[in-house]
Design a protein with these regions (language model features):
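Residues at or immediately preceding the N-termini of alpha-helices
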Residues: 103, 136-139, 151
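Conserved donor-nucleotide binding/catalytic region of nucleotide-linked donor-dependent transferases
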Residues: 144-161
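Nucleotide-sugar donor-binding catalytic core of glycosyltransferases
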Residues: 1-129, 161-188
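Short, charged, surface-exposed secondary-structure boundary motifs
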Residues: 124-125, 140-146
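Catalytic phosphate/metal-binding cores of nucleic-acid and nucleotide-processing enzymes, i.e., regions
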Residues: 78, 139, 158
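Conserved acidic donor-binding segment of nucleotide-sugar-dependent glycosyltransferases
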Residues: 131-136, 148
């Protein structure tokens, strides 16, 4: 299970969920690859430090321990994140019809997203190839329920989501150009009818 967390001072729900999930990472029993961006490294704020203390962990929550496979992401190269079967993908906000590279990067690498964000994501992708969460507590609980068989059971839906994600991974200018050309062609057909 992989995860990339950055620290922004923006007070958006998704940023707060990412920080909370990062702080609670030691509750995940399955192997993890948690990283912090070198551009915006995770720093503990007072709320996070208090949450960590309440969990009674003995170590400094920000210790960069090899035992936890927790490092600054080398050269901010995301490829390492998607060598895992599952990736925690938390959008900055939860809005209908909005999803970002946080989801697409996982789908295009056939990595199952443990996803929070777009409420109607099922309109775009097969949610049977995703793990949908509502809170950081869900993240921890569902990460602990993942077994070696989970990925294989989801494989047909992972493959379907990969095919769908390829369309969104294409450059926007290409998609816009094709849509304009399609509309022009449709308009010409109507005029010639």
């Amino acid at each position: 299970i992989s995860f990339l967390c950055t620290f922004h001072s923006r007070d958006l729900e998704g940023y707060n969920k990412r920080k909370d999930a990062f702080v609670k990472r030691l509750l995940i029993k399955n192997p993890t690859l948690f990283y912090s961006s070198t551009r915006y490294p995770v720093r503990m704020d007072i709320k996070s430090m208090e949450m960590y203390r309440q969990m009674n962990f003995q170590r400094d929550p920000m210790s960069w321990s090899a035992d936890d496979a927790m490092f600054l992401l080398p050269k901010d190269d995301k490829a390492k994140l998607f060598s895992s079967q599952f990736h925690i993908s938390i959008e900055s906000t939860s809005v209908d019809n909005y999803f970002s590279e946080k989801l697409i990067d996982a789908l295009i690498t056939k990595t199952v997203p443990i996803y929070w964000g777009c409420p109607n994501i099922g309109d775009f992708f097969d949610i049977r190839g995703m793990i949908i969460v509502d809170s950081e507590s869900d993240i921890i609980e569902l990460c602990n329920q993942i077994t070696p068989e989970t990925y294989e059971q989801m494989k047909p839906y992972i493959d379907e989501n990969y095919e769908r994600a390829k369309e969104y991974a294409r450059p926007l200018r290409d998609r816009v150009k094709e849509e304009i050309e399609k509309k022009i062609k449709e308009s010409n057909v109507k005029q010639n009818s």
